[in-house]
Amino acid sequence: MGHFTFISLCLMPIFLSLSGAECYTCPIDWLSRNGLCYKLFDDTKTWPDAEIFCRKHKPGCHLTSIHSEAESADLAEYIYDYLKSEKNVWIGLNDPQKERIWEWTDRSSTNYTSWNEGEPNNSWNKEYCVHLLASQGYLKWNDTPCESLFAFICRCQF
Protein backbone atom coordinates (compact mmCIF):
# COMPACT_ATOMS: atom_id res chain seq x y z
CA MET A 1 0.00 0.00 0.00
CA GLY A 2 2.86 2.40 0.80
CA HIS A 3 4.39 1.93 -2.66
CA PHE A 4 1.05 2.76 -4.34
CA THR A 5 0.63 5.90 -2.20
CA PHE A 6 4.17 7.07 -3.02
CA ILE A 7 3.64 6.64 -6.79
CA SER A 8 0.21 8.28 -6.60
CA LEU A 9 1.63 11.31 -4.80
CA CYS A 10 4.46 11.58 -7.32
CA LEU A 11 2.12 11.44 -10.32
CA MET A 12 -0.55 13.75 -8.90
CA PRO A 13 1.23 17.03 -9.86
CA ILE A 14 1.58 15.77 -13.44
CA PHE A 15 -2.11 14.95 -13.73
CA LEU A 16 -3.11 18.25 -12.14
CA SER A 17 -0.93 20.24 -14.54
CA LEU A 18 -2.39 18.39 -17.52
CA SER A 19 -5.96 19.01 -16.43
CA GLY A 20 -5.53 22.74 -17.11
CA ALA A 21 -3.93 22.23 -20.51
CA GLU A 22 -6.09 23.18 -23.44
CA CYS A 23 -6.48 20.63 -26.13
CA TYR A 24 -7.35 21.84 -29.59
CA THR A 25 -8.24 20.10 -32.77
CA CYS A 26 -8.71 21.87 -36.04
CA PRO A 27 -11.54 20.71 -38.27
CA ILE A 28 -10.37 18.19 -40.88
CA ASP A 29 -10.05 20.62 -43.79
CA TRP A 30 -8.23 23.34 -41.81
CA LEU A 31 -4.45 23.91 -41.53
CA SER A 32 -3.15 23.44 -37.98
CA ARG A 33 -0.13 25.51 -36.87
CA ASN A 34 1.04 26.47 -33.37
CA GLY A 35 -2.33 26.02 -31.68
CA LEU A 36 -4.20 27.94 -34.39
CA CYS A 37 -6.38 26.80 -37.27
CA TYR A 38 -6.40 28.38 -40.72
CA LYS A 39 -8.88 27.87 -43.53
CA LEU A 40 -8.65 29.17 -47.08
CA PHE A 41 -11.92 30.00 -48.82
CA ASP A 42 -11.80 30.03 -52.61
CA ASP A 43 -15.07 31.93 -53.11
CA THR A 44 -14.54 35.67 -53.47
CA LYS A 45 -15.89 38.31 -51.10
CA THR A 46 -15.27 41.94 -50.26
CA TRP A 47 -12.97 42.48 -47.28
CA PRO A 48 -15.83 43.37 -44.87
CA ASP A 49 -17.91 40.38 -46.01
CA ALA A 50 -14.92 38.05 -45.63
CA GLU A 51 -14.29 39.28 -42.06
CA ILE A 52 -17.98 38.79 -41.18
CA PHE A 53 -17.85 35.28 -42.68
CA CYS A 54 -14.81 34.38 -40.54
CA ARG A 55 -16.41 35.74 -37.35
CA LYS A 56 -19.49 33.57 -37.89
CA HIS A 57 -17.42 30.36 -37.52
CA LYS A 58 -16.70 30.83 -33.84
CA PRO A 59 -16.12 33.72 -31.42
CA GLY A 60 -12.55 34.90 -31.88
CA CYS A 61 -12.25 33.90 -35.54
CA HIS A 62 -11.07 36.60 -37.95
CA LEU A 63 -9.38 37.09 -41.26
CA THR A 64 -5.87 35.90 -40.52
CA SER A 65 -3.18 38.03 -38.96
CA ILE A 66 0.46 37.23 -39.78
CA HIS A 67 3.24 37.73 -37.24
CA SER A 68 6.42 36.20 -38.62
CA GLU A 69 8.23 35.24 -41.78
CA ALA A 70 7.77 31.56 -40.83
CA GLU A 71 4.00 31.97 -40.45
CA SER A 72 3.90 33.87 -43.74
CA ALA A 73 5.80 31.06 -45.51
CA ASP A 74 3.51 28.37 -44.05
CA LEU A 75 0.41 30.24 -45.19
CA ALA A 76 1.87 30.94 -48.64
CA GLU A 77 2.59 27.23 -49.13
CA TYR A 78 -0.89 26.27 -47.91
CA ILE A 79 -2.58 28.80 -50.22
CA TYR A 80 -0.43 27.81 -53.19
CA ASP A 81 -1.25 24.12 -52.65
CA TYR A 82 -5.01 24.55 -52.24
CA LEU A 83 -6.14 27.56 -54.25
CA LYS A 84 -7.50 26.37 -57.57
CA SER A 85 -6.55 29.53 -59.46
CA GLU A 86 -4.14 32.38 -58.96
CA LYS A 87 -6.32 34.73 -56.88
CA ASN A 88 -5.29 37.37 -54.40
CA VAL A 89 -6.23 36.51 -50.80
CA TRP A 90 -7.60 38.85 -48.11
CA ILE A 91 -5.89 38.99 -44.70
CA GLY A 92 -7.10 40.77 -41.57
CA LEU A 93 -5.03 43.94 -41.86
CA ASN A 94 -6.87 47.19 -42.50
CA ASP A 95 -6.87 50.93 -41.87
CA PRO A 96 -10.24 51.44 -40.15
CA GLN A 97 -9.78 55.16 -39.43
CA LYS A 98 -8.35 55.88 -42.91
CA GLU A 99 -5.29 57.50 -41.34
CA ARG A 100 -2.62 55.04 -42.61
CA ILE A 101 -2.55 53.30 -39.23
CA TRP A 102 -2.77 49.58 -39.94
CA GLU A 103 -4.56 47.25 -37.51
CA TRP A 104 -5.29 43.53 -37.39
CA THR A 105 -8.95 42.67 -36.86
CA ASP A 106 -7.94 40.34 -34.00
CA ARG A 107 -6.26 43.36 -32.33
CA SER A 108 -2.87 41.66 -32.28
CA SER A 109 0.47 43.41 -32.69
CA THR A 110 1.47 44.88 -36.06
CA ASN A 111 5.22 44.56 -35.48
CA TYR A 112 5.72 42.22 -38.48
CA THR A 113 5.04 43.45 -42.01
CA SER A 114 5.66 42.10 -45.49
CA TRP A 115 4.63 44.90 -47.83
CA ASN A 116 5.37 44.56 -51.53
CA GLU A 117 7.84 47.12 -52.86
CA GLY A 118 6.24 50.59 -52.92
CA GLU A 119 3.35 49.55 -50.68
CA PRO A 120 1.24 50.62 -48.94
CA ASN A 121 0.60 53.42 -51.42
CA ASN A 122 -3.11 54.21 -50.93
CA SER A 123 -3.60 54.62 -54.67
CA TRP A 124 -6.43 57.04 -55.47
CA ASN A 125 -6.91 57.58 -51.73
CA LYS A 126 -9.15 54.53 -51.31
CA GLU A 127 -6.96 51.56 -50.34
CA TYR A 128 -7.74 50.63 -46.75
CA CYS A 129 -7.68 46.82 -46.77
CA VAL A 130 -4.83 44.37 -47.35
CA HIS A 131 -4.42 41.21 -49.40
CA LEU A 132 -1.68 38.70 -50.18
CA LEU A 133 -0.41 39.11 -53.73
CA ALA A 134 -0.77 35.99 -55.87
CA SER A 135 1.89 37.40 -58.21
CA GLN A 136 4.38 37.38 -55.30
CA GLY A 137 3.70 33.82 -54.19
CA TYR A 138 1.38 35.03 -51.38
CA LEU A 139 4.41 36.31 -49.46
CA LYS A 140 3.90 40.05 -50.04
CA TRP A 141 1.10 42.42 -49.03
CA ASN A 142 -0.73 45.11 -50.98
CA ASP A 143 -3.27 47.70 -49.88
CA THR A 144 -6.35 47.82 -52.06
CA PRO A 145 -9.97 49.02 -51.99
CA CYS A 146 -12.03 47.02 -49.48
CA GLU A 147 -14.76 46.46 -52.10
CA SER A 148 -12.46 44.31 -54.27
CA LEU A 149 -13.44 40.65 -54.55
CA PHE A 150 -10.78 38.17 -53.40
CA ALA A 151 -10.45 34.73 -51.85
CA PHE A 152 -9.73 34.90 -48.10
CA ILE A 153 -8.20 33.03 -45.20
CA CYS A 154 -9.69 32.77 -41.70
CA ARG A 155 -7.76 32.06 -38.50
CA CYS A 156 -9.43 30.52 -35.45
CA GLN A 157 -8.59 28.80 -32.22
CA PHE A 158 -10.81 25.74 -31.74
UniProtKB/Swiss-Prot annotation:
Disulfide bonds join 26-37, 54-154, 61-156, 129-146. A motif (Mannose-binding) lies at residues 119-121. Gene3D superfamilies: Mannose-Binding Protein A, subunit A. Glycans are attached at residues 111, 121. Its main location: secreted. CDD domains: CLECT_REG-1_like. GO terms for molecular function: carbohydrate binding; metal ion binding. Keywords: Calcium, Disulfide bond, Glycoprotein, Lectin, Metal-binding, Secreted, Signal. The keyword Calcium applies. GO terms for cellular component: extracellular region. Expressed by the venom gland. Ca(2+) binds at residues 127, 142-143. Coiled coil: none annotated. It is found in: Secreted. Residues 33-155 form the C-type lectin domain. Residues 1-23 form the signal peptide. It holds the Pfam family Lectin_C. Belongs to the true venom lectin family. Mannose-binding lectin which recognizes specific carbohydrate structures and agglutinates a variety of animal cells by binding to cell-surface glycoproteins and glycolipids. May be a calcium-dependent lectin. Homodimer; non-covalently linked. This is C-type lectin.
